[in-house]
């Protein structure tokens, strides 16, 4: 069976960057990695209703900079930004180091209908609320295409509708080239915990192609090549008159 690689992992280092950006030695690497996992879990739990798509972390030995990408900036900031101090305190408790300097930057997602994580979370929430999994997917696809996406693909799997046997159903609209590395594919997973069991939700959204300036400038130019007439030698042979064969002289 063919195995499908993660579209995000395939493009990291090509057109996408890492969610955690730092360098550490062997002893600190494991410690910082576990801290990043705990920080993300704690912040996602605290900001459950704030439509948070992604949390990126940059750090040095003395400082941690956290970027929270959300569609609801006001909910994350709170009144006059009071919620930021609460989140900084939560990070200090999570990592167990109050001396570490923590900075939190909130980044607004201007088009939430084309963000794969937010779309997947919306589908999962509506499935939990007993909405039809087919109509929920169709509505999400309609909104994404209207918002400017070039293509979208959705998939839900599990005991859909409470049936005994689990199955997978999904829809696709537009172009979603998963094997083209220059295409910007946003991929996300979400889980819906229903009374019948767990239902998985996957969303792929194509936002177009990302090309470097060099590739864009040279792509319009037509390649130069020399025209060669491979039949020239054969034509010359045809035009030439056939050589007369020498006639053997009769012996007297």
Swiss-Prot record:
Residues of the signal peptide: none
Organism phylogeny: Bacteria, Bacillati, Mycoplasmatota, Mollicutes, Entomoplasmatales
Compositionally biased intervals (Basic and acidic residues): 219-252
Stored InterPro entries: KH_dom, KH_dom-like_a/b, KH_dom_type_2, KH_sf_prok-type, Ribosomal_S3_C_sf, Ribosomal_uS3_bac-typ, Ribosomal_uS3_C
GO MF term list: mRNA binding; rRNA binding; structural constituent of ribosome
CDD domains for the chain: KH-II_30S_S3 (cd02412)
GO cellular component term of the entry, any: cytosolic small ribosomal subunit
Recorded name of the encoding gene: rpsC
Stated family: Belongs to the universal ribosomal protein uS3 family.
Subunit annotation: Part of the 30S ribosomal subunit. Forms a tight complex with proteins S10 and S14.
SMART domains for the chain: KH (SM00322)
Protein name: Small ribosomal subunit protein uS3
Record Pfam families: KH_2, Ribosomal_S3_C
Function: Binds the lower part of the 30S subunit head. Binds mRNA in the 70S ribosome, positioning it for translation.
Record-level GO BP terms: translation
Domain KH type-2: 39-110
Chain intervals for the UniProt region annotation (Disordered): 218-252
Keywords of the record: Ribonucleoprotein, Ribosomal protein, RNA-binding, rRNA-binding
Family annotation (SUPFAM superfamilies): Prokaryotic type KH domain (KH-domain type II) (SSF54814), Ribosomal protein S3 C-terminal domain (SSF54821)
Superkingdom field: Bacteria
């Amino acid at each position: 069976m063919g195995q499908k690689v993660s579209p995000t992992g395939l493009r990291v280092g090509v057109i996408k960057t890492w969610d955690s950006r730092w360098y550490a030695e062997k002893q600190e690497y494991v410690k910082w990695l576990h801290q990043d996992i705990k920080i993300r879990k704690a912040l996602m739990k605290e900001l459950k209703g704030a439509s948070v798509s992604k949390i990126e972390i940059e750090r040095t030995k003395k400082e941690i900079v956290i970027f929270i990408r959300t569609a609801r900036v006001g909910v994350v900031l709170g009144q006059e930004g009071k919620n930021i101090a609460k989140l900084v305190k939560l990070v200090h408790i999570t990592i167990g180091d109050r001396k570490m300097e923590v900075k939190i930057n909130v980044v607004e997602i201007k088009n939430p209908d084309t963000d794969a994580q937010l779309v997947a979370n919306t589908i999962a929430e509506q499935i939990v609320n007993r909405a039809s999994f087919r109509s929920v997917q169709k509505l999400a696809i309609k909104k994404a295409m209207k918002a400017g996406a070039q293509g979208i693909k959705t998939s839900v799997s599990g005991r859909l509708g409470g049936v005994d046997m689990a199955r997978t159903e999904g829809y696709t609209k537009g172009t979603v080239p998963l094997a083209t590395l220059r295409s910007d594919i946003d991929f996300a997973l979400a889980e819906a915990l229903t009374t019948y069991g767990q239902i998985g939700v996957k969303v792929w959204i194509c936002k177009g192609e990302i090309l470097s300036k060099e590739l864009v400038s040279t792509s319009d130019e037509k390649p130069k090549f020399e025209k060669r007439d491979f039949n020239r030698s054969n034509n010359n042979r045809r035009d030439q008159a056939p050589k007369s064969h020498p006639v053997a002289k009769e012996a007297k």
